[in-house]
């Protein structure tokens, strides 16, 4: 489901922490050449803090709080910050409770950008039914973040 995938990637790429497990991999998968250089530990910690806050805001269903982690210039294919805003509104209308668990598998830096590879899952309790349902899970998916005014924000692939 496109709606949930974008929101999950939003939370995954920029936040690391509340329910995240420790950094899983320091080396790329065998045979896979990843862009950039290994990310310094200080930057990993900054990304973890940003992720923790984004997850907290997502689970609180705080649209503005989640979107504060997305660059105004965000673009991945046709997906923009405005589209993410609409997707959040749909999710917040469908579910009365949301949970996200995200682990940053690896992060690579290239200039002011960080390629963040994450694994995670999102579940929600359907409004009016009270039923918990898995919404999305992903493994080692990339997202691009960049530092804007001293804060890490999702930036997208800019295609």
Labelled PLM ranges:
Residues 1-5:
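N-terminal secretory signal peptides that target proteins for export/translocation
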Residues 24-60, 68, 77, 103-105:
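Short, low-complexity N-terminal intrinsically disordered segments enriched in polar/charged residues
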Residues 63-107:
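A solvent-exposed, acidic/Ser-Thr-rich amphipathic alpha-helical stretch
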């Amino acid at each position: 489901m496109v709606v949930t995938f974008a929101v999950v990637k939003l939370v995954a790429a920029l936040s690391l922490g509340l329910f995240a497990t420790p950094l899983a991999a320091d080396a790329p998968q065998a045979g896979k050449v990843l862009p950039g250089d290994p990310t310094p530990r200080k930057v990993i910690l900054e990304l973890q803090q940003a992720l923790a806050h984004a997850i907290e805001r997502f689970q609180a269903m705080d649209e503005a709080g989640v979107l504060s982690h997305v660059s105004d210039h965000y673009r991945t294919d046709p997906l923009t910050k405005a589209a993410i805003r609409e997707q959040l509104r749909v999710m917040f209308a469908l579910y009365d409770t949301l949970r996200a668990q995200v682990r940053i598998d690896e992060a690579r830096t290239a200039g002011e950008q960080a390629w963040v590879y994450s694994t995670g899952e999102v579940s929600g309790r359907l409004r009016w039914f009270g039923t918990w349902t898995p919404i999305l899970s992903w493994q080692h998916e990339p997202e691009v973040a960049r530092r804007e005014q001293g804060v890490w924000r999702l930036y997208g692939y800019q295609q």
